[in-house]
Amino acid sequence: MKISLVVPVFNEEDTIPIFYKTVREFNELKEYEIEIVFINDGSKDATESIINKIAASDPLVIPLSFTRNFGKEPALFAGLDHATGDAVIPIDVDLQDPIEVIPHLIEKWQAGADMVLAKRSDRSTDGRMKRKTAEWFYKLHNKISNPKIEENVGDFRLMSRAVVENIKQMPERNLFMKGVLSWVGGKTDVVKYARAERVAGDSKFNGWKLWNLALEGITSFSTFPLRIWTYIGLFIAGMSFLYGAWMIIDKLIFGNNVPGYPSLLVSVLFLGGVQLIGIGILGEYIGRIYIETKQRPKYILKRKGFKSEI
């Protein structure tokens, strides 16, 4: 039985040898044929040469290298495209997702699950701000989007070959893999685990990338941000009508002077701000439509094995 590990890497020269040694020396995985698909996402350090050196001595290691940094989501998709195992497990190279969890994922899969989620029961290794923003994101996403995504579940999970083939059919270029993996469905089970510290190096996923990923997740699976502006427009129109009616009554019945310039200025600035926000959200969706219509590939490979490829 072949199990494929999909491992995106970006400037991870320190962690790759540790990850590889840990996988190959873990006794509970020796009964399986463990394929490792490394995806080098445009690294600037020695990542590519390290991967190629490992692959030269291990036929079960598939080295893929992008022509530039395309991002983690395309890297995951590339790994799924090239993995050949009966089951596929995306996993981070920093070993924050422990190798010891993999046999439990395989056990649930062999019991009949199409997808087995690895759920973090302890995120104490993450900073307080990261934990809080992740909590807010999950709540917002699951409130306004469909399908829902399991809280505290990253990319670390096991997928059957059937699930992987279904994912590979999806044509979109703007990828939010957590949503994509939830969208395909199938019988799902969960394994809980405590997340560990990084074995070496620093995380390459900064706050700006997390923010963009959150936007991608919401705009890829929800039209609520567009729909809400219909309700905001109706509310503002209703309030404007009531305010106008009050000014007429106040003038005709009570004889009070209607304030002119200040109220007009406030109204114009308020409506202008609301419109700019609405246009910005609309622009996010139009930008994604524009990218999709160009039908560019999700990624371009510089290297597959030892042959140049595009």
UniProtKB/Swiss-Prot annotation:
Record flagged with keyword Magnesium: no
Subcellular location(s) per record: Host membrane
SUPFAM superfamilies in the cross-refs: Nucleotide-diphospho-sugar transferases (SSF53448)
Pfam families in UniProt: Glycos_transf_2
Keywords: Glycosyltransferase, Host membrane, Membrane, Transferase, Transmembrane, Transmembrane helix
Primary subcellular site in the record, as a coarse category: host cell
Transmembrane segments: 229-249, 263-283
Membrane topology: Multi-pass membrane protein
Enzyme Commission (EC) number: 2.4.1.-
GO CC annotations, alphabetized: host cell membrane; plasma membrane
Annotated InterPro entries: Glyco_trans_2-like (IPR001173), Glycosyltransferase_2 (IPR050256), Nucleotide-diphossugar_trans (IPR029044)
Superkingdom: Viruses
A molecular-function term among this protein's GO annotations: glycosyltransferase activity
Function: Involved in O antigen modification. Catalyzes the transfer of the glucose residue from UDP-glucose to a lipid carrier.
Entry similarity comment: Belongs to the glycosyltransferase 2 family. GtrB subfamily.
Stated name of the protein: Bactoprenol glucosyl transferase
Organism: Salmonella phage P22
